[in-house]
A protein has these predicted regions:
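Flexible, glycine/charged-enriched surface loops at secondary-structure junctions
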Residues: 5-9, 28-35, 78-80, 143-145, ...
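Ferredoxin-type iron-sulfur electron-transfer modules in oxidoreductases and energy-metabolism complexes
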Residues: 546, 550-581, 585-723, 841-847, ...
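Terminal amphipathic helices with adjacent charged low-complexity linkers/tails
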Residues: 274, 281, 306-416, 454, ...
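Mobile "lid/hinge" segments at catalytic clefts and subdomain interfaces of large enzymes
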Residues: 157-159, 163-250, 254-325, 330, ...
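N-terminal flexible segment immediately upstream of the FAD-binding catalytic core
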Residues: 1-72, 76, 86-118, 147, ...
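Iron-sulfur cluster-binding electron-transfer modules in prokaryotic oxidoreductases
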Residues: 529, 536, 690-1018
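Flexible inter-domain linker/hinge segments
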Residues: 2-5, 203-248, 254, 524, ...
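N-terminal glycine-rich flavin-associated loop
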Residues: 46-77, 81, 99, 103-148, ...
Length: 1018
């Protein structure tokens, strides 16, 4: 039995008083003080961890103004505040103690657009890709690019002055901010914009906080103008935080306070709204993907690409390329970046040309390609080949692979992981190759592996050395390397932070600004935040305040993780290796990962949130001397005793009375998971939440009773075959309002599905498929066996959607084969989902033995439902290891592909069909949709794959009363609107859960694609 974890970092009373004051004064947002909520805000995409006191989620600028006004009261003057956006920073920019003000949950509205004047007004929590999705129909986009664009907020981009691919042409975020609405501590609101310096001088006369700020900034930037121009490097990625260089125009006639706030990392004010300029979408885009024999060749060839008038040049090294090959993303780009025969591709330059003049763009590209042909022919420059990509979909796929690079590095094998701390250095592009030679030598001298990729056109290369932050010696080495890189960038006239902001690296600021200008930064900080209460420790401290800065060698996630025994860390690597890249925060409702995060907006209910809580739970167990691995080994031998039941009942009673146990907070996070497994493939780190979730649930319920619904779900494969013997009787009762009400209230289950009537056996009555025994099959000759197909049943299609299985039997026959319906053998998936792992192991072992025996016949085994078939491949291998054997159960499309491979495609006739893929299937088998389309093409039909997220059913998740609203809400995100615009009779879905959800909500369901094929053949 696991112990109670009753201790959690407490809350300061004044923090609770502040939150109560917010509530009393009409705050419309959310507040959070649980340990779980605070832990999810304690990390970002960096190596650091800092636990905040509380989190607030304002809904409007008025809410932020209320926070700031109350913060200005004397009783709360000891509290500090840190604004937070997407939480994707790589250097802890938004991490702090104190109160986190999260702008991402609610403040995500696009407020106004003026196409004629070319601007848009947004709230700070709007996500970059969300804005571009909105702008696309107008023919515009917000041009600063970054790899986390599908989860990074514009407020975060502004606060770090973010930039990325294409910055040589498009510049940094600050180049596109026309004005900001910001709230100062005390509640005063200011609106910034570029204005005549004379007007700024007038504002500076006001005896307000705004007037004080204008006076200070005007005076300091004028007085130190010559030194500013001397010290600030003339780079595309110019020095920010604070951007003294661009406050005044070159002729000193224009003043823009916006430039001070962009890149300020929330140290000066709360930015709540922004007016941004927007850029027309280029009418023509072309990519030339240039392949090299080495990364050094790619680097040294990059300046030539820039001279060829390219919009951007992105470089990727062999380490990143090889990791991409092992990821789900590679199937989408492997034809666009194909290997060169007899050559090894060890470097790649992605060169983009874009504009409105097709002839000009094509001419620029052809000039480059001619030069590349010469280099290849002469075997110079390390160029081994290139490919051109001219279609927008292909271009987006390549950039998605490039954007995933940072996450892919985190999936490198071993304890040492490539980490960010010197990953966005910037030097003049002409010095980049030489700079990288020295940088690589530094890392090689310490025998470190590393991955490199970046924006070589701008002189920015992302370098991530692999270090184990659980090893104190390597933690010290990280600081040593960081210091050396600072000196190296200075040597080449560059910057340590060319893209991602300073964060914990602000301690190096004096070395780049110089002491005089650094003092000016402190004066400006004092004008905005004299008491050092906004994100303290970042950028600089106010001039009159003697406060320490955050340090590069501050407390890291590894400091906490190393308290967990190595064996436990290794066993739970699915949780421990989360690096916070945040891809699970993707705003796009069509992305399958993660439906619970999308519907709740609560990061506890994301793979990152769940991984964070489990790693802390493991640490707290270790603190009490508890080994979860030993407990897991003991469980199969344990038997339920009266004493144990009494103890569990007592523990559960105390829990119901409010007795604290951190395990309850972890359980709450795990209960929201749909177990769709999208994270296990879509996450670049392959964080497998359903895997460690089932292990947690098993251990949690050694201490606490299970709800009745858990037993009902886990036993579905035991009682369903029995009920199916009298489906009309059971369906009669299932339709009764009183039973449905009792099911909801007593068991916690809703909308229970009706059993198939007629049953599968009745539909196939007398059919040869149901009469052959295993012994008879074993007696068949090799020739006879080649004619047979063995259908592996699952409980859902066989008993609740039997016509699909019956139709598959007919389809197999129509294709000239003899189907055989194998006896039903429980799969155990539901047991795994609910954490009955001991029972699941028994089920899996028994079924694996049966399927291994059947597999020896040499006949194909085919299952209908993707989730159940994939369970044989994943969960069975995980729980049984080598005992699983080597049986293989194919999905319907996999078998069809093999059987009709030599059948020629036929001209498509009639309306297209539309395929809605199952989440588990489309993420585990990303080519499945295209494979179904190819199968349909061979029968003269067109099949289009529909891009949707999760349907919200996920096995029994949608039938549990506590999940009902989320289940319906998830369906509304993408499935409902998509189905409304398509002809229902042409829509198809491979998953039983998906078809069941459509039928429940829409009233009439959709068919399995095999049924459409059968219809075509018949």
């Amino acid at each position: 039995m696991i112990p109670q974890i009753s201790q959690a970092p407490g809350l300061v009373q004044r923090v609770l008083d502040f939150l109560e004051a917010l509530k009393q004064n009409g705050f419309n947002g959310d507040t959070a003080t649980s340990y779980a909520d605070r832990l999810t805000m304690a990390t970002d995409n960096s190596i650091y961890q800092l636990l905040p006191d509380a989190v607030v989620f304002p809904r409007s600028t008025a809410d932020v103004a209320l926070i700031a006004r109350l913060a200005g009261e004397e009783r709360f003057n000891a509290l500090t505040f840190s604004p937070r956006g997407g939480g994707t920073g790589t250097n802890g920019q938004s991490l702090n103690t104190g109160i986190v003000v999260d702008m991402s949950r609610h403040m995500n509205r696009i407020l106004e657009i003026n196409v004629e004047q070319g601007w848009v007004k947004v709230e700070a929590g709007v996500i970059k890709d969300q804005l571009n999705q909105y702008l696309r129909p107008f023919g515009y986009f917000f041009s600063p690019e970054l790899s986390t664009s599908n989860r990074a907020t514009l407020g975060g981009m502004i606060n770090t002055d973010a930039s990325g691919q294409g910055s040589l042409v498009y510049g940094k975020t600050s180049d596109h901010v026309l004005g900001l609405r910001a709230v100062l501590l005390g509640g005063e609101m200011i609106d910034t914009r570029a204005m005549p310096t004379a007007l700024a001088e007038t504002i500076a006369l006001d005896e307000t906080a705004e007037g004080r700020i204008y006076r200070t900034v005007l005076n300091r930037c004028r007085e130190q103008r010559a030194l500013i121009l001397e010290k600030f490097p003339k780079l595309n990625r110019f020095l920010t935080g604070y951007d003294l260089r661009h406050v005044l125009s070159d002729d000193l006639q224009t003043f823009d306070l916006t430039r001070i706030l962009t890149g300020a990392e929330g140290t000066l004010a709360f930015i709540t709204e922004a007016r941004l300029d927007i850029t027309p979408l280029p009418k023509v885009r072309r990519l030339v993907n240039v392949k090299y024999d080495s990364f050094d060749s790619a680097l040294r060839n990059a300046p030539f690409m820039v001279e060829a008038k390219a919009l951007s040049v992105e470089t990727i090294d062999s380490k990143v390329l090889n990791l991409a090959r092992e990821d789900i993303v590679w199937h989408s780009v492997n034809e666009l970046i194909a290997d060169v025969p007899d050559k090894e591709m060890l470097g790649l330059n992605i060169v983009e040309f874009a504009g409105d003049d097709r002839a000009l763009i094509d001419g620029q590209m052809e000039t480059l390609c001619q030069r590349l042909d010469e280099l290849i022919a002469q075997r110079q420059g390390g160029v081994i080949g290139y490919q051109i990509c001219g279609d927008l979909a292909g271009i987006e796929r390549i950039y998605n692979m490039r954007k995933k690079a940072v996450g892919l590095l985190g999936n490198a094998k071993g304890r040492a992981k490539p980490i960010p701390f010197a990953e966005d250095t910037c030097v003049p592009p002409q010095h980049l190759a030489d700079y990288i030679v020295e940088f690589r030598q530094l890392l090689d001298d310490h025998n470190l592996s590393y991955g490199m990729f970046g924006h070589v056109d701008a002189g920015v290369l992302h370098v991530r050395p692999a270090l184990d932050m659980c090893d104190p010696q390597q933690e010290v080495l990280m600081k040593h390397i960081s210091d050396r890189v600072v000196a190296l960038t200075a040597k080449y006239g560059g910057l340590l932070w060319g893209e991602h902001g300073k964060g914990f690296r602000a301690e190096y600021s004096p070395e780049f600004f110089g002491e005089t200008l650094y003092e000016e930064l402190r004066r400006i900080k004092a004008a905005f935040d004299p008491d050092n209460r906004l994100n303290p420790g970042k950028i600089c401290a106010p001039l009159a305040v003697d406060a320490p800065m955050m340090q590069v060698d501050a407390v890291k996630r590894g400091t906490f993780d190393r308290q967990i025994p190595v064996e436990v860390r290794t066993s739970f690597r699915g949780a421990l290796e989360c690096n916070g890249n945040g891809l699970c925060f993707n705003f796009d409702v069509r992305s399958p990962m993660c439906p619970s995060m999308k519907i709740s907006g609560n990061r506890i209910h994301s793979p990152k949130g769940r991984a964070t809580l489990v790693r802390e739970w493991l640490r707290l167990l270790a603190e009490q001397g508890v080994d979860p691995l030993a407990l897991e080994k003991q469980l199969p031998q344990q038997r339920l005793s009266l004493r144990g039941l009494i103890e569990k009942t007592r523990n559960s009673w105390h829990a119901g009375k409010g007795e604290y146990d951190f395990s309850h907070e972890v359980k709450e996070a795990m209960s929201g998971c749909l177990a769709c497994k999208a994270c296990s493939t879509q996450c670049p780190i392959k964080i497998d939440v359903p895997g460690f979730r089932s292990r947690f649930l098993q251990l949690y319920h050694t201490r606490y009773l299970r709800p009745v619904s858990d037993y009902m779900v886990a036993g579905v494969e035991s009682y369903t075959p029995l009920m199916a013997r009298a489906p009309k009787v059971f369906n009669f009762f299932f339709r009764q309002p009183w039973l449905r009400e009792m099911s909801r209230n007593a068991i916690g289950m809703v909308d229970l599905p009706l059993l198939s009537s007629p049953t599968l056996r009745q539909q196939l009555s007398g059919h040869r498929a149901t009469t052959l025994t295993l012994e008879q099959l074993e007696g068949l000759s090799a020739e006879q066996r080649a004619e047979h197909v063995l259908i592996v049943q699952d409980p859902f299609t066989s008993y609740y959607d039997a016509k699909v299985v019956a139709d598959f039997v007919r389809l197999v026959e129509k294709l000239g084969y003899k189907p055989v319906l194998l006896p039903f053998s429980p799969n155990g998936k539901a047991q795994h989902v609910k954490g009955f792992l001991t029972r699941f192991a028994r089920t899996a072992r028994k079924t694996a033995d049966f399927l291994n025996r059947v597999a020896q016949l040499g006949m194909p085994l085919v299952g209908v439902d993707p989730a159940l078939v994939l369970c044989y491949r994943d969960e069975y291998r995980e729980i049984l290891g080598a005992e699983r054997g080597d049986f293989q159960v194919l999905l319907v499309h996999e078998w069809l592909q093999q059987r009709i491979a030599d059948r020629a495609e036929q001209p498509a006739t009639g309306e297209p069909w539309y395929l809605f893929g199952h989440c588990t299937e489309t993420t585990a088998l990303p080519a499945s949709g295209q494979q179904w389309a190819a199968i349909f093409a061979r029968f003269g039909a067109k099949l289009e794959n529909v891009s949707v997220g999760c349907c919200g059913m996920a096995g029994t998740y949608g039938h549990e009363a506590k999940n009902l609203q989320n289940s319906l809400g998830i369906y509304e995100l993408s499935w409902h609107p998509t189905l409304q615009r398509l002809p229902r009779q042409r829509c198809l879905a491979t998953g039983y859960s998906c078809r069941s959800q459509v039928k429940r909500i829409e009233g009439n369901g959709v068919r399995h694609p095999l049924q459409a094929l059968l219809e075509m053949i018949e």
